[in-house]
Every structure is written in C-alpha cells, then in structure tokens.
Amino acid sequence: NMIIVGIECGHEGEERLNEYCPYSVNGGFLGHAKGVGNDTVRWVVEELKEVIAREYRTYPFRECMAVAGSSMGGLMALFAVIRYNQWFSKAACLSSALGFCLPSIYHDVRSCPIDPDTRVYLSWGTREARGVTDHTREDKSSYMSRRNRSIANYLRARGATAQIFCQVGGQHCEADWGKQIQGF
C-alpha cells in the first residue's frame, strides 16, 4: 500500500517558481526566483509528514519515504532526496528544471551526506530536449541528456543508485510524465 500526497503550489505571480526553486536565481530564462524551495521541503518533513502520520498508519522510516515531481517539481524532488536524505530514500525527477541552478545541485550532491540506499530516477523526453532533431531515437547528446547523465554519475560516485530514462517522442507534459513515472 502507498499514500500519495500532492502539494498545490501558489498560482499568483511567481509563487510557483519561488516555492519550487530551492536556490535563489537571478537571470537566465527564469528571471528572478526568490528560491524558498528549502522552506517548502522543510515544511513537508516537519509539518505535513506529521499531519499524515496522525491521520494514517505510516512507516516512519526513510526507506518508506519517496518524493516525486515534474519540471520544477522534479528539481524539488532531486533537491529533497539530496539535501533531506535522512528523510527521503527515493526520488523520481521527471523533466526536471535543472539548467538554471546546476552548479548549486552539483555542490549539494558533492557535499551532502547521501545514504547508499538512495535511489534516484531521472527522466526526460526527446521532444523537450533542445537540439534533438531525431525524435525516434533515444537522446544521448542534448544538454538535457548531458545534465541528467552527469547528475546520475555524481550520485553513483556517492554510492547511490541512479537510473535515467529518455522517452522517445516524449514532451514536457503531464501525459508523458505519466508514462515516464512507470519506470520508477
């Protein structure tokens, strides 16, 4: 059995970007993001998790806690499993918005304690990866492919298990994320 909890983000202005970005960003295609994602994950582990545990029978072990998300949520899932690894043992990161804060992610994956029992699933679709011209074959060279593969390699170097999946013909949309999550 599994309990799945969906978290609604703010919809006014740039609230979603601020809530789902764990690092402050100034520039690039996002413009400015305040980066309160760390507060969001802290709220999940310190408050939301407790509410769920009071209402439902749960296992309190990190091995029973996973986090998943797509796009900015994929970035948050990766951040959570790295920075809050004492709470989360697994993460599904679908079409993660990684590009604008990659140096911060690399820093965290190199410096945060990561349990060897950590499993991370990274996915994307060929139709969302810039530079891919043949959408009938797996993408092995786009920027999106390279950054997901490099994060997987960093995680593996730290003893974690990392799986990557490129959905041939996949787009940056919920219908394709529904297909990608099946590999998790």
Feature names for model-found ranges:
Residues 1-184:
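Non-catalytic cap/lid and distal C-terminal segments of serine-dependent acyl enzymes
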